[in-house]
């Protein structure tokens, strides 16, 4: 008997950065396949796993505020979780502002 599995990746990510000088914005572009969705970042306790971001510490770089979505999520009651849930379909951008103490020595490779 043979068994095969496939890793499903219904969300593809691209990351870009914009901004001048000391303050920059990291933009996480999510492309969501039809039939799938990406849960919002603020799902209530007892619900599904929310979308979250974690960042490594980089010397002379600090996070400014929280990751913010570019639009409000679609909201709908879920009988499975017995609560109102938010999610995104198709595409969504999440943004994180960073502050760089010395932009001349900051390089992305």
Region spans (language model):
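Extracellular/lumen-exposed scaffold segments
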Residues: 3-109
């Amino acid at each position: 008997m043979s068994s095969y599995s496939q890793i499903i990746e219904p969300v593809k990510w691209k990351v870009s950065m914009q901004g001048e000088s000391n303050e920059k914005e990291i933009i996480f572009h999510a492309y969501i396949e039809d039939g799938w969705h990406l849960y919002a970042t603020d799902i209530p306790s007892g619900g599904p796993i929310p979308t979250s971001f974690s960042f490594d510490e980089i010397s002379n770089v600090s996070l400014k505020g929280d990751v913010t979505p570019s639009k409000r999520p679609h909201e709908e009651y879920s009988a499975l979780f017995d609560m109102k849930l938010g999610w995104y379909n198709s595409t969504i951008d999440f943004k994180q502002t960073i502050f760089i103490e010395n932009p001349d020595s900051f390089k992305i490779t």
